[in-house]
Amino acid sequence: MPPIVNNLLENDLYKFTMWQALLHSHPEAQTEYEFVCRNAPAYPLSELKADVERELDHLCTLAFRDDELLYLRSLRFMKSDFVDFLTVFRFQRKFITVAADGPALRIRAIGPQVHVMGFEIFVLCIVNELYLRRFDQQASLTEARRRLQEKIRLLKNFGKEATRKNPFEFFDFGVRRRFSAAWHEEVVVTLAREVPQYFTGTSNVHLAKKYGLTPIGTMAHEYLQAYQSFGVRLRDFQKAALEDWVQEYRGDLGIALTDVVGMDAFLADFDLYFAKLFDGLRHDSGDPIEWGEKALAHYARLRIDAGSKRLVFSDALDLPGAFSLYRHFADRTLTGFGIGTNLSNDTGIPALNIVMKLMACNGQPVAKLSDSAGKTLCRDETFLAYLRQVFHHPAVK
């Protein structure tokens, strides 16, 4: 079968934006990323080891093509020196290892952050597609197409509802857990054709380039987590990360992620300066209604018109959930909805809940204190307890 990954642009936009920011601010950072499967697969993922090794061998032969680099240069927030770096960039096979750990698959990328952070999305795509190849492909695609048509029907019926102050906008965040590259492309093309009034873009930079769509994304947890090890006082790591982001992008890419140490701790750092500079906030764990109300109350306390800001929701969303959140918030603020697995891998086969997370930076543990049970990741319980103490973040049961 052909390789799963065939071009390096088929990655989330926020991978490039974080990559650029970290290359400029902390090019010397040494990091460790680790693959984790959060749920029980239908068969042991360790059986995929040899195939994953082969796919990674191929990945490390790829380079950015001239037309891909030209596209990145066309994005106003991409700097010429970063694209020049990508011109000579190659993944180094020595930085990533694959091992069977009983029934589990252990994948670790260890090395300079600017050389290993790009592995994440490709590893997830590779594992997910290899895993799903053992299921009935034709039956899966038939069911996936039926479900996609049902989503389009839901969207068209939703259009008959009373108009709200702000429009409903959703976008594709599905590259990391897609059924396959071909199916992901079919989903994006179909939505762009059938419901362009609602479907506003994709995080997949390759598909955005190919179909003239808006590439979507700003930052992920790893960007903020890395600052836990960058020499600032731990209590100040979020402020340092946000400040460097502001200096890098000067008003572009203005959606801040809030749940690295919980929403309450984030808002304590998100003062008038940041609240004015950033265009909005992204929710990725915890109760979305409670989170959104906290965000709006925070803007009100700072005397900022929430109608000029945007709340982006991206935590395990489907369309009915997005509609419900839209109805709740759309008359008070701009909204946006990033839908991933439910778009690119809704086939009837239970999806793997897989991630590849930053676990250490510069020899120190880093952690995310999620607002949802099961999403907190850290190997060092002592550091985790200290982080909870510093940010007054209780364990989520």
Curated annotation (Swiss-Prot):
GO terms assigned for molecular function: nicotinate phosphoribosyltransferase activity
GO cellular component: cytosol
The reaction(s) this protein catalyses: nicotinate + 5-phospho-alpha-D-ribose 1-diphosphate + ATP + H2O = nicotinate beta-D-ribonucleotide + ADP + phosphate + diphosphate
GO BP: NAD biosynthetic process via the salvage pathway
Keyword GTP-binding among record annotations: no
This protein's pathway: Cofactor biosynthesis; NAD(+) biosynthesis; nicotinate D-ribonucleotide from nicotinate: step 1/1
TM region positions: none
Keywords: Ligase, Phosphoprotein, Pyridine nucleotide biosynthesis
This enzyme's EC code(s): 6.3.4.21
Phosphohistidine sites (modified residues): H221
UniProt PTM comment: Transiently phosphorylated on a His residue during the reaction cycle. Phosphorylation strongly increases the affinity for substrates and increases the rate of nicotinate D-ribonucleotide production. Dephosphorylation regenerates the low-affinity form of the enzyme, leading to product release.
The family this protein is said to belong to: Belongs to the NAPRTase family.
PANTHER family for this protein: NICOTINATE PHOSPHORIBOSYLTRANSFERASE (PTHR11098:SF1)
Function field: Catalyzes the synthesis of beta-nicotinate D-ribonucleotide from nicotinate and 5-phospho-D-ribose 1-phosphate at the expense of ATP.
HAMAP family: NAPRTase
Protein name: Nicotinate phosphoribosyltransferase
Species annotation: Herminiimonas arsenicoxydans
Lineage, uppermost ranks: Bacteria, Pseudomonadati, Pseudomonadota, Betaproteobacteria, Burkholderiales
Gene: pncB
